């Protein structure tokens, strides 16, 4: 259902991992660093992360504590989909169990956005769920467009339609941010 309850206990604290069955994608989620650990069974969702979240460089993650840790596809025979605010370590932690019901990229993306947004709110910052593009018109004039809304509201589709219907007028379109800023 895409609603992730908060738990008062770290959901990954006592978990055991076979390192041959897991990958880590160090994602840049806005200005935050998220280590996304995904089971090899969910490779399709894991590699798709690069379409939405830029891969952090080694310089950006080496010897640095992440702001968020997300374990996706843990084989526990349950349907866990929790997040935890680890105040002691100043980070967000999340777990999503391996389950056919969760075998969908939206579950990976939405939990990451939930962690990002809760962390930003806790830091007294306003998370933006939207996108911004900078358009250079054929005349050379530059315009910025921000599209905001709930999940499924049509933000990405709106930007795609701007590209299609504005093609004759647009010289260049640069995505400033997509999904959060």
Residue ranges: model-predicted function:
Residues 1-143:
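A noncatalytic interaction/capping subdomain that flanks phosphate/NTP-handling catalytic cores
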Residues 96-97, 131, 150, 178-180:
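Fold-independent oxyanion-binding glycine-rich loops
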Residues 105, 126, 151-155, 176:
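Active-site-proximal structural scaffolding
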């Amino acid at each position: 259902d895409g609603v992730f309850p908060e738990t008062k206990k770290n959901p990954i604290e006592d978990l055991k991992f076979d390192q041959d069955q897991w990958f880590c994608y160090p994602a840049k989620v806005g200005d935050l660093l998220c280590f996304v650990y995904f089971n090899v069974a969910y490779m399709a969702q894991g590699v798709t992360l690069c379409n939405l979240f830029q891969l952090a460089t080694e310089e950006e993650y080496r010897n640095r504590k992440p702001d968020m840790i997300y374990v996706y596809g843990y084989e526990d025979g349950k349907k866990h989909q929790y997040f935890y605010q680890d105040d002691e370590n100043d980070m967000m932690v999340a777990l999503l169990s391996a389950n056919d019901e969760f075998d969908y990229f939206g579950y990976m993306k939405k939990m990451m956005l939930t962690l990002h947004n809760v962390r930003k709110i806790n830091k007294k910052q306003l998370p933006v769920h939207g996108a911004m593009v900078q358009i250079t018109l054929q005349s050379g004039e530059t315009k910025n467009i921000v599209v905001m809304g709930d999940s499924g509201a049509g933000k990405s589709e709106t930007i795609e339609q701007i590209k299609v219907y504005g093609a004759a007028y647009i010289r260049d379109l640069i995505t400033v941010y997509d999904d959060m800023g």
